[in-house]
């Protein structure tokens, strides 16, 4: 099996409502959709959702980089994923969303060629994933009302975006907990907004509110600060922006910096690198979450769900980006309907078509 053509197009899908985090506000899911065609006529689908707040990538830059990658991998076998990543790394030192788009399409082709759903090729641990759902930053009463609505849809785990000041953040969490009760798990994500001391103060102030975990409380490069927070609180601390690739994961693990690591395909460059991160973490006794960018659509979320289902050490999922989309850019894959259970089915590869 050899790659014959690589096509890329821009996809811009309006969100049902704006999504605000500590780093900024997102109004649409802007991503690059890739189709890799083989000489025998198979077509693999990939996606690069460039999260400018996280990776610094733009849609225009991602499209251009994918064009360069596409020209360079013509004639290669999608199964030779190590070689394909070597080719991409020589062209661009970073560009994780662009690399993820090519990577995901190659894995889709592998599944199609093997006539197996992708999760079977990646480990086959399960065929479904349970995801949380995220509440963007808003006034406490508004977030509490939305939390109740999400619980009515069947979600038992809510991820709460915080990061506009610890007093306001504490008020948000208290309002949500009072609205949904204590049977619902609450996760917090500060997106690097707190100082280490403020993080400890906020987490300790919320001790009675049973927070499951706190994600990326401090600046991504402040590993000492991250370790300080982890050492000072009983709540589970998770790295997100501090872990882009396997090298980052190794450093976090060696230093005992956090309790959990969040893997995102758009952060690490695709499934190939994500597997390395998970293997490092599993060896060290560190569980992983699989997360997503708000810019992702059906393809990226479906690929992440297959990886999460396949690997036992990926114990949590935050794969809710499709729930906010007005429409989907492709047919098949995970549903746009907001529901906690993502069922993957038995279609070969990702189960996606144009």
UniProtKB/Swiss-Prot annotation:
Assigned keywords, A-Z: Isomerase, Magnesium, Metal-binding
Binding site for Mg(2+): 189, 215, 240
Transmembrane portions of the chain: none
Co-factor(s): Mg(2+)
Pfam family name, one: MR_MLE_C
Extra information: Part of a large, functionally divergent protein family. Protein modeling and substrate docking was used to predict the substrate specificity, prior to biochemical analysis.
InterPro entries reported for this sequence: Dipeptide_epimerase, Enolase-like_C_sf, Enolase-like_N, Enolase_C-like, Mandel_Rmase/mucon_lact_enz_CS, Mandelate_racemase_C, Mandelate_racemase_N_dom
Gene Ontology MF: a single term: racemase and epimerase activity, acting on amino acids and derivatives
Function: Catalyzes the epimerization of L-Ile-L-Tyr to L-Ile-D-Tyr (in vitro). Catalyzes the epimerization of dipeptides, with a preference for substrates with a hydrophobic or basic amino acid in the first position, followed by an aromatic residue in the second position. Has epimerase activity with L-Ile-L-Tyr, L-Val-L-Tyr and L-Arg-L-Tyr (in vitro).
Binding positions for substrate per the UniProt entry: 134, 159-161, 191, 264, 292-295, 318-320
The protein's name in its UniProt record: Hydrophobic dipeptide epimerase
EC number per UniProt: 5.1.1.-
Annotated cofactor note: Binds 1 Mg(2+) ion per subunit.
Family: Belongs to the mandelate racemase/muconate lactonizing enzyme family.
Lineage: superkingdom: Bacteria
GO-annotated biological processes: amino acid catabolic process; peptide metabolic process
């Amino acid at each position: 099996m050899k790659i014959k053509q690589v096509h890329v197009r821009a996809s811009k899908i309006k969100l049902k409502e704006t999504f605000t985090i500590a780093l900024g506000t997102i109004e649409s899911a802007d991503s690059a959709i890739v189709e890799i065609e083989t000489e025998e006529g198979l077509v693999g689908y990939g996606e690069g959702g460039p999260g400018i707040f996280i990776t610094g990538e733009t849609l225009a830059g991602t499209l251009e980089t994918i064009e360069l990658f596409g020209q360079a991998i013509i004639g290669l076998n999608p199964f030779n994923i190590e070689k394909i990543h070597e080719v991409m790394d020589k062209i661009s030192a970073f560009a994780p969303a662009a690399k993820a788009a090519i990577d995901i399409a190659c894995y889709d082709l592998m599944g199609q060629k093997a006539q197996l759903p992708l999760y079977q090729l990646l480990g086959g641990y399960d065929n479904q994933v349970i995801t949380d759902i995220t509440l963007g930053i808003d006034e406490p009463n508004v977030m509490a009302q939305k939390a109740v609505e999400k619980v009515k849809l069947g979600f038992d785990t809510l991820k709460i975006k915080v990061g506009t000041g610890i007093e306001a953040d504490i008020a948000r969490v208290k309002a949500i907990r009072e609205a949904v009760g204590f049977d619902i798990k609450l996760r917090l994500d500060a997106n690097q907004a707190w100082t280490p001391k403020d993080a400890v103060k906020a987490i300790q102030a919320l001790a009675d509110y049973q927070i499951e975990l706190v994600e990326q409380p401090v600046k991504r490069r402040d590993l000492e600060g991250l370790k300080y927070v982890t050492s000072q609180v009983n709540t589970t601390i998770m790295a997100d922006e501090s872990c882009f690739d396997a090298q980052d994961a190794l450093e976090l693990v060696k230093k005992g910096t956090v309790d959990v690591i969040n893997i995102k395909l758009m952060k690490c460059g695709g499934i190939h690198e994500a597997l390395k991160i998970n293997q490092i973490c599993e060896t060290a006794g560190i569980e992983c979450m699989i997360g997503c960018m708000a810019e992702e659509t059906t393809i990226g979320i479906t690929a992440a769900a297959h990886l999460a289902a396949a690997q036992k050490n990926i114990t949590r999922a935050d794969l809710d980006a499709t729930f906010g989309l007005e429409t989907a850019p492709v047919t098949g894959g995970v549903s746009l309907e907001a529901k906690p259970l993502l069922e993957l089915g038995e279609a070969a590869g990702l189960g996606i078509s144009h």
